[in-house]
Amino acid sequence: MPEGVSQDLLEKLKKNTTAEIFYDNFTRGRYSTDASIYQMMPHGVLIPKTKSDIVETINFAREAKIPLLARGGGTSQCGQTVNQAIVIDNSKFLNKILHFDKEKMICIVEPGIVLDELNRFLKPYKLWFPVDVSTSSRATIGGMAGNNSCGGRSIRYGMMRDNVIGIEAILHDGSTYNFENLELKNLKVNDGIAPKIISNLLKLALKNKQEILAKFPKVLRRVGGYNIDALLPDAMASRPNGKVGDGINLSHLLVGSEGTLAYSTSVTLKLSPLPAQKIMGICHFPSFYEAMDAAQHIVKLDPIAVELVDDTMLRLARDIDMFKPTVEAVVKGNPKSLLLVEFAEDNMDENLSRLRKLHDLIGSLGYSWKGDVKKFGGVVDVISNELQSKVSEMRKSGLNIMMSMKNEAKPVSFVEDCAVELKDLAAYTDGLNKIFDKYETKGTWYAHASVGCLHVRPVLNMKLQDDVSKMRNIADEASELVKKYGGSFSGEHGDGIVRSEFNEVMFGKKMIDIFRVIKTSFDPDNIFNPGKIIDAPKMDSRNLFRYAPGYSSDNISTILDWSIWPGQAGGFQGAIEMCNNNGTCRKLEGGVMCPSFRVTRDEKDSTRGRANSLRLALSGQLGKEALTSDEMNETMSLCVSCKACKRECPTGVDMAKMKLEVSSLRTKKYGLNLHEKLIAYLPDYASFASKFPSLFNLRDKIPGASKLSEVFLGFTAKRPLPKWRKDFFKNSELPDSLELNHSQLPVILFVDTFSRYFEPENVRSAINVLKAAGYFPFLPSSNKSSRPLCCGRTYLSNGLIDKAKFEGEKLLSTFLPYLKEGVPVVGLEPSCILSFRDELPSLIKDPNIDLLKNNSFTFEELLSNNCKKINFKKMNEKVLLHGHCHQKAFDAVKPIQKVLNMIKGLEVELIDTSCCGMAGAFGYNKKTYDVSIKMAQEKLFPAISKTKSGTTIIADGTSCRCQIKDGINRDAVHLAQFLDKNIIY
C-alpha cells in the first residue's frame, strides 16, 4: 500500500459505506492509466452505490488528507483521470436517469450514465443529447461535464457547457448544493459554504472582467482553465444558441473543472430534437492544405458537422477488417484528405438542396473528377442511413485507428486538439506541420474542421528520452503558435497533466492567480484531483509516464506467434501494448465486445482491464510471477474467448489469443484440476465413452447425481450435460480418399468432436447438402492414430498448447496432399474450423500451414459460392438467425444470410446479439454458470422470446444451441439441418 494509506484505513471506510472497495495491486493497476501517456498508481478504488457513499468518502478523505479522483469511462487523453488518490468509479452503479421531462426537453442523470445509453432511452421520444463525442459508447455524462466535452456537431449544438443547465455537487465539507441558473438562487451567505463561495467568485469575476475578456480565446472550442467567464453578467448570451437575458448559470463553473472543485452527483441536461433526416457528402481533396482552406467556405452552407479524415487514417482503416468495406464504399481514388460534411434539416428536400450546393461549391473551387490531376476531387454522396452510420463510426474511431500502428512509435496526444478560427486554420496547420518537420516526425490529422479544432498527434516513441524531448519542444512551440492566432491550446480534451502547465502561457500569471482562488475557495484541503489545471507537474515528467524510465518487460518464452509486433517475448509485449486505453471494449450495445464487461460492468472484465493487467504483470509491476498468479487467473476467468476484440477493437487487441498464452504458462506451472482435465481431454476419451452412452448419460437421470458432479467435478447442476449419442458419426460413413469423379467437386469434410458424438445428425445433413450442391465430401484418415482427427480446441482452452499443436500438426499432415491439389476443407462447428485460420497458424511453424489457413471454410462460406445447383422448396416462413461469436469475428455471418436468401419465400431475421454466454465449457462450470446465463439474458433470450414458439432458430454453434435450449427451452438447428429438410432431392 502507498505510504500513509493503510489497509486498515480503507477497511474502516469500507465498513461505513455500501461501496465496493479494492486496494490490491491488480485493481489499482487497472485504474492507474487512462487514454493518456501517464500512469499514476491510486491508493485504492471505490465503487459507490449511493450518494451517501460519496459523502462518507469525501468526509473520510478530508480528515485523512487523502486525495479523491472521480472517474467515469476513463477515456481521458490528457491524464485527467489518473492520480495518486482514491479513485471513485461512478460507471457501475451511479448510472441512472433520475428525471425526464419530454415537454421541457430536460433530464437529470447520475454521473455514471453512458452517453449512448442515455440517447437510446431518448430516441423513442425523438430527442437526444447532442454533445456527440467520439467515445459516446463508453463516455459518461459526469466525465463529459468534468471535461467540457464537445463532439463532432458542436458547430450546431455547442459544448457540454452549452447543454448543461444544472449540477448537484458535494463540496469539500460534505454538504450538497445545486448549481443552476443564478436567477433561481437566493445566495444567503450564512446558508452553507456554497453561497459564500459563489458570492465571492461573482465579485472576483466582475472585478477582473476586462482581464477575462482580454485573455480568454474568442474561439468556440475553448476548454482550458476554469470557466470564470461564465460568472460575468449575461455570460450565456455569447454562447451558441444563447440570447441576451439568459444570465449566469453557476453550473458552468463546474463544467470543465476536471473534478478539481467538487463532486458532481447529478447533472441536469438540455435536450434537443433528434434530427429527422440526415445526409452526407464526402469531399475529396488532393492535398491537406486545400481541404483546410475549403472548410471556411463549406461551413457557410450551415452543415451540422464538417469532419476531416486524412490519408494516413484512410490507409490504416483499409487494414482493419471492420472499416475496410466502408473505405472502399465511399472513397474515390487516392485523396490526401476528406471532409465529411453532414446536413440534418427536418426536410429531406432541404438536405438534398444543400448537398447540391456542396457539389457546386467544390466545383467552383476548381475540383473535378476529370481533367487536372492537381485538382482531382469532388463529392461522394452518402444517402443511406446505414452507410452514414458506418462512416461516422469510422471517424469516431479515429484515435484508435491511428493507434493501430504496429511499432513502438505511436501518435501521441499532447497538441491534438488546439483550436483556432477557421480563417486561420490552413495557416495554423501548415505552421504546425513545419514544427513536426523540424523535429523529424509527422502528424496524423482528423476531426472537427467545422470549428477549427483538428486532432493531430505526432508519431513518437515515449520509451525514448530523445522523443520525449521532441514532445517537450513541439509542445512549447505549438503553444506559441496557437497563441499567435488567438486560439485555444485545448479545444476539446481539456488540461489534465499534459496541458495544465501551459495555462500560464495561454492565460497569463494574473489569470492563473484567479484560477488558484477558485480552486482554494472550493477545495481548501486540496482533496479533489490535485495537480490538474493549476499547480500541475511538468507534462514531460517521465516518472509519471506509463513507460517510465527503466520500463522493460520480461523476455518470457512464448508458444504462439507474436512476431508482427515489436518488443520482448517474441512480440507479446508489443501486442499487449497495442491497448491504448480508449475503452471501446466498454461499449454496452452493438457488436459483441465485451460480453463479460456488459454483464458485470467491472473494469477487470473488460478487454482494456485485462490488457492493463497483462502489461503491468509482464513488466514486473505486479510482483514476481504475476502472469501465473491467482489474481491473473481471476482476471482472465470471465473472458469467454469470443474473439470479438480481435475484430472490434480498432487497435486489434486479441485477448482470446493472449489468454491462450497466459493459460499455457499457468497450466505448465500448476497443471489442471479434474474438471479442466475432463474438458481438455474430451477428444481422447470420447471414442471410449461413445460405446457406453447410457452409462455416461446417467448423470442427468439419477436423482442427486448432477449435484454430486457439481461438488466433485465442478459441472453445474443447473443445466444438463450434452447427451452422448449411440448413433454417433463414424468415419466409415464418408469415403476416406478422393475418388475420381469429374462431375463433383472434392471437399474434405472435417468432423469435429462435438458434432461426431453429440449431434451426428448435423454431419449427415451436411453430407446430403454438399452432395446436392455438387460436392464430393470425404474425410482422409490419419495413419498416426486410430482416434479421429481433432482441431485441438479443448486443449487450447485449457492451456495445453503443446497438445493442441500436436493435434494441429497431425491434421495438417493428413490433409496436406489434398490441400496441395487445391481441395478445400469445410467444417460445421465455427470454433473448430475457424481455428484452422487463427490459432493453428499462430502455433504451427510449418510453412504449409498457410495452405490450411487459406483453404478452410465454414459450411456456409463454401455453399455461398456454389449453391446454385440446389433446388430448394418454396417457403412462406420466417427464421431467426443467431451468429456464433467466431463467425462474427471473421465476418462469416453474411454467407449464412446469402445462402438462406436463395430460398424463395423465406424471411431471415438476423438477431442483434452479443455472445450467447455458453462459450463451450464456460456455461457448464459451476463458477461461471450465472454469468453465462446473464450474457444470454442481455440480448439473445429476449430476442427469441419475442417470437412465436414455432419459429425456426438457426444457430451454427453447438454452444449457442445448448444455451438456447437450456435457458428458454427453445430448439435451435444448424444451417445444415435446416437446408437438408428444405431441399428437393
Descriptions of predicted regions:
Residues 1-63, 73-105, 134, 157, ...:
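N-terminal flexible segment immediately upstream of the FAD-binding catalytic core
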Residues 13, 36-68, 90-133, 145, ...:
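N-terminal glycine-rich flavin-associated loop
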Residues 523, 530, 656-985:
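Iron-sulfur cluster-binding electron-transfer modules in prokaryotic oxidoreductases
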Residues 36, 146, 154-160, 164-393, ...:
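C-terminal substrate-binding/cap subdomain adjacent to the FAD-binding core in PCMH-type
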Residues 267-272, 292-295, 300-409, 443, ...:
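Terminal amphipathic helices with adjacent charged low-complexity linkers/tails
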Residues 27, 76-79, 135-142, 220-231, ...:
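A glycine-rich phosphate-binding loop feature that marks nucleotide/adenosyl-phosphate handling sites
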Residues 117, 189-239, 243-246, 522-595, ...:
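Flexible inter-domain linker/hinge segments
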Residues 10, 408-409, 484-489, 496-638, ...:
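Ferredoxin-type iron-sulfur electron-transfer modules and their immediate structural context
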